[in-house]
From Swiss-Prot:
Name the UniProt record assigns to this protein: mRNA-decapping protein OPG121
Protein's job: Decapping enzyme that remove the protective 5'-cap from both host and viral mRNAs to commit transcripts for decay by the cellular exonuclease XRN1. Accelerates viral and cellular mRNA turnover to eliminate competing host mRNAs and allow stage-specific synthesis of viral proteins. Acceleration of the turnover of cellular transcripts may even promote the shutoff of host protein synthesis.
The UniProt record lists the keyword Magnesium: yes
Cofactor(s) of this protein: Mg(2+); Mn(2+)
Species the sequence originates in: Variola virus (isolate Human/India/Ind3/1967)
Amino acid sequence: MGITMDEEVIFETPRELISIKRIKDIPRSKDTHVFAACITSDGYPLIGARRTSFAFQAILSQQNSDSIFRVSTKLLRFMYYNELREIFRRLRKGSINNIDPHFEELILLGGKLDKKESIKDCLRRELKEESDERITVKEFGNVILKLTTQDKLFNKVYIGYCMSCFINQSLEDLSHTSIYNVEIRKIKSLNDCINDDKYEYLSYIYNMLVNSK
């Protein structure tokens, strides 16, 4: 299975509309975000779990008071349990029901390109930082995917670029250690996330990057 150049594949989740397209090169600009679809030495696809959910982060950025939260109920299913408890603590009225204690904010590892960096140097730096220096890169793949994500909750569009990255560590090397990175709380196998809304399109990304020529 493969994806031809400029062919677009669309996925939709309750929160996102994602366009995936194979391209030749990653543009270099101050706003370029690059991500690595990491494969362990024993063949497992890796994914990161954010320390803070995007929904809670957005709510915090919009608040004018430290004591009052105004929250749309449609956001609640996309937050961590501790974040919901904080919202509940500040509620003047209403209640929070149907909490999912197993929610995780899954993301590909990577980040924003520094203008002085190459694409691969940026990914090496980001992987080192986000794993507390546990991940080292063996080699990168040659296939590049452009990911265009429309966040339906906040009506925003994000563009990123992704390539495969084969690392020197096994899944066991990474799964039994604590991470203290400010953004990432855990690195785990994507195979353990089959019930997540993002699993289908993340699996597709990994399959395209690993199997395409």
